[in-house]
């Protein structure tokens, strides 16, 4: 006997007004993740995933484009207010915050959550160019 066709249920997008933008700015790439208050990811974008490869991936403009792309998807969830958590020393720290502000989000506060070791692992050797 043939199985009755099951109807695919349309996934309901939850409406979130407040969110947290986690910006991870390393020397090589910038990752922007927008979550709800509980930490569940709503949208994310990277500089590499936005079409930048190689040394162009580690530029402030690439971080700006990544933040804009993550912001567009987050707007579909109804996010209006953002709290920004910035981690890392990379070049995309400031430009990603500016891009989120220009995208129409109201930034409530900015926090630097860069992990600082209490003399943990040995850091990488200094670059000689």
Swiss-Prot record:
Any one GO CC term of the record: ribosome
SUPFAM superfamilies (UniProt xref)? Translational machinery components (SSF53137)
Query: Which terms are listed as keywords in the entry?
Result: Ribonucleoprotein, Ribosomal protein, RNA-binding, rRNA-binding
Q: Is this entry keyworded rRNA processing?
A: no
A GO molecular-function annotation: structural constituent of ribosome
Xref: InterPro entries: Ribosomal_uS11, Ribosomal_uS11_bac-type, Ribosomal_uS11_CS, Ribosomal_uS11_sf
Q: Name one GO biological process term.
A: translation
Which PROSITE patterns does the protein's record reference? RIBOSOMAL_S11
Annotated membrane-spanning segments are: none
Question: Known Pfam families for this protein?
Answer: Ribosomal_S11
Report the family membership: Belongs to the universal ribosomal protein uS11 family.
Known partners and oligomeric status = Part of the 30S ribosomal subunit. Interacts with proteins S7 and S18. Binds to IF-3.
Q: What does this protein do?
A: Located on the platform of the 30S subunit, it bridges several disparate RNA helices of the 16S rRNA. Forms part of the Shine-Dalgarno cleft in the 70S ribosome.
The protein's name: Small ribosomal subunit protein uS11
Q: Which organism is it from?
A: Tolumonas auensis (strain DSM 9187 / NBRC 110442 / TA 4)
The gene designation is rpsK
